[in-house]
Amino acid sequence: MSSAKLGSASEDVSRRDANYHPTVWGDFFLTHSSNFLENNDSILEKHEELKQEVRNLLVVETSDLPSKIQLTDEIIRLGVGYHFETEIKAQLEKLHDHQLHLNFDLLTTSVWFRLLRGHGFSIPSDVFKRFKNTKGEFETEDARTLWCLYEATHLRVDGEDILEEAIQFSRKRLEALLPKLSFPLSECVRDALHIPYHRNVQRLAARQYIPQYDAEQTKIESLSLFAKIDFNMLQALHQSELREASRWWKEFDFPSKLPYARDRIAEGYYWMMGAHFEPKFSLSRKFLNRIVGITSLIDDTYDVYGTLEEVTLFTEAVERWDIEAVKDIPKYMQVIYIGMLGIFEDFKDNLINARGKDYCIDYAIEVFKEIVRSYQREAEYFHTGYVPSYDEYMENSIISGGYKMFIILMLIGRGEFELKETLDWASTIPEMVKASSLIARYIDDLQTYKAEEERGETVSAVRCYMREFGVSEEQACKKMREMIEIEWKRLNKTTLEADEISSSVVIPSLNFTRVLEVMYDKGDGYSDSQGVTKDRIAALLRHAIEI
């Protein structure tokens, strides 16, 4: 606890301090820019030429279906599938024939199954039955086949016992074989055992796979070169977006005005880029990056620094959504409030009204108000000593985790669909959004509850579960990990059942969940971004791929 002075905050109030480290980037992204495309029209020409070559490879008719399946998968894993969405969809529709697999080996069946399920095609898991021996066991010691099988099992849904058996079998065999493998297969297996492709941030997975594919003897030179050039071109765009966000962050001077809060504008951009990296969503990323930044400041204010009286005043001001309300909140909070209103005004002017869908701003503001209300409830838990039931805690946490808000704002930002009906549906927290939100909450709480307890908080999913069901801390944590798997199966199931309306929510739900899996895989990688998070951001946003 510390007694702090900040703006007009009460001087005698005892306040908590989370001791968040300063930004690990300094002003690097404020000034850094790629020179990859500078005065180099030949790169753009080469990129276009290679893109056409890859397209031709993808669409050419062939009777060699295993090779076509492998090529389609490689294009997607290398991060260039967004160039060929129409062609890939057409190929997958041709491959969606349940009888095709009868001629495939286990490796090809695994890739085929993962590709089709990953794109919403319903494929029964019993396609793997014919690969079991008379004892009902899988039989293969081929590492590449085991890797492909292991990756496929992560698209399982509840009740698929054969995939439960397959994941145990393939993981055990791969762990035993890994020390004997050589690059690049060794790295493919190591990456999969750490974070399977289906649960990985797709941009990060591409960054990992590009050098692995480049080292394969069977690589297609034009595809390998195209993936490298495309990565560097996209990186230049992403750097320019982060540079713009860094300028906005610095202009408001949030780090010095709010020293108790996390200074994480680069980490926030990494979060939003992980959710949708494609060039056509540039404006959406810019808006959502600012939303992550301002939401993080509000979260830290409610969670760490503000008194109950102060945060209640801020909540009331958010409900009013009026610049005149700024005079009714503590001075140190005013920069947050002004920044918040400015973000949504820019969003309305530059993204929503430009598309003639001005009704979207009401959804955006309401979902933001909703998350502030959830922060208010959590502040009341701490300041009043109230201990909610497990269900009550989880109901609020589905909102405070932010994923409902981010999914809805991403839908608005992408603007690809008949939005009003989709937004109405997503606002009800359907199974797809709920599963994504619950995974986020379980992962977050497992990695943060001990640090939060050190600063006086006693309410978390772990502690609420322990208290309500009379189990040990170890048992509660085990239950949370089991629930993550259950919710992943539910999320997989909802993507397979998606209709015209819900299909637009599939990608946001999956991608935001993937970002959480990666951000928190070795701890709270957002609050403490000095280790693996920094390395991943550097790989995606600092270091170009050598060509």
UniProtKB/Swiss-Prot annotation:
The keyword rRNA-binding does not apply. It comes from the Eukaryota. It holds the Pfam family Terpene_synth. Pathway: Secondary metabolite biosynthesis; terpenoid biosynthesis. GO terms for molecular function: magnesium ion binding; sesquiterpene synthase activity. SUPFAM superfamilies: Terpenoid cyclases/Protein prenyltransferases, Terpenoid synthases. Mg(2+) 3 binds at residue 444. It catalyses: (2E,6E)-farnesyl diphosphate = delta-guaiene + diphosphate; (2E,6E)-farnesyl diphosphate = alpha-guaiene + diphosphate. Its EC number is 4.2.3.87, 4.2.3.93. Its cofactor is Mg(2+). Mg(2+) 2 binds at residues 299, 303. Keywords: Lyase, Magnesium, Metal-binding. InterPro entries: Isoprenoid_synthase_dom_sf (IPR008949), Terpene_cyclase-like_1_C (IPR034741), Terpene_cyclase_plant_C1 (IPR044814), Terpene_synth_N (IPR001906), Terpene_synth_N_sf (IPR036965), Terpene_synthase-like (IPR050148), Terpene_synthase_metal-bd (IPR005630), Terpenoid_cyclase/PrenylTrfase (IPR008930). Induction: Up-regulated by methyl jasmonate. Belongs to the terpene synthase family. Sesquiterpene synthase involved in the biosynthesis of delta-guaiene (53.7%) and alpha-guaiene (44.6%), two structures composed of five- and seven-membered rings. Also produces 1.7% of alpha-humulene. This is Delta-guaiene synthase 2. It comes from Aquilaria crassna. The gene is C3.
